[in-house]
């Protein structure tokens, strides 16, 4: 759940940054309405129960509602939609509007079966893409924490040049307090 919170909190901070861009023709105070966060989880039996609790605390999931069979037909996925103003920090503290959290439109897709990452990407593009019709899509793995302005800069690359078909951000290892994580050769590399 810490990895999920790190990623989600980073995304929510990025949405707040977009809303602070008050001189922008695209973003500004109502910029959150132009962003939809889609979480696709691979397998109802596989998802970490603590991560599911964090998602429930943010208002995106209700425990006990999901069934694996409805009307004698197997269920493929469970979809929850909600607009929240709550974030859970990587240190598991709940923050809301009083800390600058903007509303965030969320879709949580909990797939019934574990069918791996590529299938999750297909779910996003094939199931949600035609409905949302996004101009830009940013895919993040759980544990990746975008910097506070990262999503804006990725979006800007597409906005400036309509010929751009893909972009990749810089990945930086978290060094930890006083750089202690650098003692781990995998992090230091």
Curated annotation (Swiss-Prot):
EC number(s) per entry: 2.4.1.16
Main enzyme class: transferase
Subcellular location: Cell membrane
The reaction(s) this protein catalyses: [(1->4)-N-acetyl-beta-D-glucosaminyl](n) + UDP-N-acetyl-alpha-D-glucosamine = [(1->4)-N-acetyl-beta-D-glucosaminyl](n+1) + UDP + H(+)
One Pfam family from the record: Chitin_synth_1
Superkingdom of the organism of origin: Eukaryota
Family listed: Belongs to the chitin synthase family.
Keywords, in A-Z order: Cell membrane, Cell wall biogenesis/degradation, Glycosyltransferase, Membrane, Transferase, Transmembrane
InterPro entries, per database record: Chitin_synth, Chitin_synth_fun
One cellular component (GO) term of this entry: cell septum
Single GO MF descriptor: chitin synthase activity
Role: Polymerizes chitin, a structural polymer of the cell wall and septum, by transferring the sugar moiety of UDP-GlcNAc to the non-reducing end of the growing chitin polymer.
Topology term for the membrane: Multi-pass membrane protein
Disulfide bonds listed in the record: none
GO biological process, one term: chitin biosynthetic process
Name of the protein in question: Chitin synthase 1
């Amino acid at each position: 759940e810490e990895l999920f919170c790190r990623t989600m909190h980073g995304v929510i901070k990025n949405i707040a940054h977009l809303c602070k861009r008050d001189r922008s023709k695209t973003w500004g105070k109502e910029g959150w309405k132009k962003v939809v966060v889609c979480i696709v989880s691979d397998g109802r039996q596989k998802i970490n129960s603590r991560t599911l609790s964090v998602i429930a605390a943010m208002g995106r999931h209700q425990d006990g509602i999901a069934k694996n069979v409805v009307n004698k037909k197997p269920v493929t996925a469970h979809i929850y939609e909600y607009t929240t103003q709550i974030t859970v920090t990587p240190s598991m503290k709940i923050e809301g509007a009083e800390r600058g959290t903007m509303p965030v439109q969320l879709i949580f897709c909990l797939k019934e079966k574990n069918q791996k990452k590529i299938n999750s990407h297909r779910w996003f593009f094939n199931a949600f893409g035609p409905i949302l019709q996004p101009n830009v899509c940013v895919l993040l793995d759980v544990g990746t924490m975008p910097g506070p302005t990262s999503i804006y800069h990725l979006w800007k690359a597409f906005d400036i040049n309509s010929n751009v078909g893909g972009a990749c951000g810089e990945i930086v290892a978290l060094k930890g307090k006083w750089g202690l994580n650098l003692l781990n050769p995998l992090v230091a590399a």
